């Protein structure tokens, strides 16, 4: 499973949004209705799924689904 698909599954599960709404350009707040607590929980779940720690200063830069995928991909290089 690609990282995008893993991230998408986590978002759908955590936020309860329709999978069709989860695109790389989708904003967590504006398009998916996430608040700051939802985003913090998503970051923690991404950390667990990908076995990493995302520093707060990096987590603050993750505003879209694509941002999250790019960050995860950057860890694997």
Swiss-Prot record:
Q: In which pathway does it act?
A: Lipid metabolism; fatty acid biosynthesis
Protein modification: 4'-phosphopantetheine is transferred from CoA to a specific serine of apo-ACP by AcpS. This modification is essential for activity because fatty acids are bound in thioester linkage to the sulfhydryl of the prosthetic group.
GO BP field: lipid A biosynthetic process
A GO cellular component annotated for this chain's UniProt record is: membrane
Name the SUPFAM superfamilies for this protein.
ACP-like
KW Cytoplasm (keyword) present = yes
Domain spans labelled Carrier: 1-76
Q: Does the keyword Phosphoprotein apply?
A: yes
Alphabetical keyword list: Cytoplasm, Fatty acid biosynthesis, Fatty acid metabolism, Lipid biosynthesis, Lipid metabolism, Phosphopantetheine, Phosphoprotein
Modified sites of kind O-(pantetheine 4'-phosphoryl)serine: 36
Any single GO molecular-function term of the entry would be: acyl binding
Job description of the protein: Carrier of the growing fatty acid chain in fatty acid biosynthesis.
Q: Which family does it belong to?
A: Belongs to the acyl carrier protein (ACP) family.
Q: What is this protein called?
A: Acyl carrier protein
Please report the organism this UniProt entry assigns to the protein. Staphylococcus epidermidis (strain ATCC 35984 / DSM 28319 / BCRC 17069 / CCUG 31568 / BM 3577 / RP62A)
Q: What is the lineage of its organism?
A: Bacteria, Bacillati, Bacillota, Bacilli, Bacillales
């Amino acid at each position: 499973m690609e990282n995008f698909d893993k991230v998408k599954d986590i978002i759908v599960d955590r936020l309860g949004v329709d999978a069709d709404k989860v695109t790389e350009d989708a904003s967590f707040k504006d398009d998916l209705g996430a608040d700051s607590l939802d985003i913090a929980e998503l970051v923690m779940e991404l950390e667990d799924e990908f076995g990493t720690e995302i520093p707060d200063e990096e987590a603050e830069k993750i505003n879209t689904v694509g941002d999250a995928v790019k960050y995860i991909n950057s860890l694997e290089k």
